[in-house]
C-alpha cells in the first residue's frame, strides 16, 4: 500500500473565521486568509509556512504565531476548539 502524496493544493484545515477573518485555510506550504477590509472589500492574505517559526500562544479563539521577522501573526477563528485544531494541523505540516 502506497502512502498518499500531498501536493501544495491539498487542503488540510478550513474555518470560517470571525471578525475581520472570513476564511482561514491551511495548505502544506501556506496559510491563506480572506480578510474583510475597512471599506467592505475583501482581500486574500498569504503567509508561507517557511516563514513561521512556531506558535506563540492561543488566547480564546485567537492564535498568535511567531515568524522570522519576530512579529506576531494573529488569526481569529470561530471557536476555541477550532483554534486548537488549527494549531494541531499546523504542527502536522511544520
Task: Please report, for each region that a protein language model flagged, where it lies by residue.
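Broad, structure-driven detector of short, well-ordered beta-strand segments within folded domains
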Residues: 22-28
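Acidic, Ser/Thr- and proline-rich intrinsically disordered linker/docking segments
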Residues: 2-19, 32-35, 39-94
Amino acid at each position: 500500500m502506497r502512502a498518499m502524496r500531498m501536493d501544495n493544493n491539498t487542503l488540510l484545515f478550513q474555518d470560517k473565521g470571525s471578525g475581520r477573518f472570513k476564511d482561514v485555510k491551511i495548505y502544506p506550504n501556506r496559510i491563506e486568509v480572506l480578510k474583510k477590509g475597512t471599506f467592505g472589500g475583501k482581500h486574500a492574505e498569504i503567509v508561507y509556512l517557511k516563514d513561521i517559526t512556531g506558535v506563540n500562544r492561543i488566547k480564546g479563539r485567537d492564535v498568535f504565531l511567531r515568524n522570522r521577522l519576530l512579529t506576531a501573526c494573529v488569526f481569529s477563528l470561530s471557536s476555541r476548539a477550532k483554534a486548537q485544531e488549527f494549531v494541531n494541523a499546523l504542527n502536522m505540516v511544520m
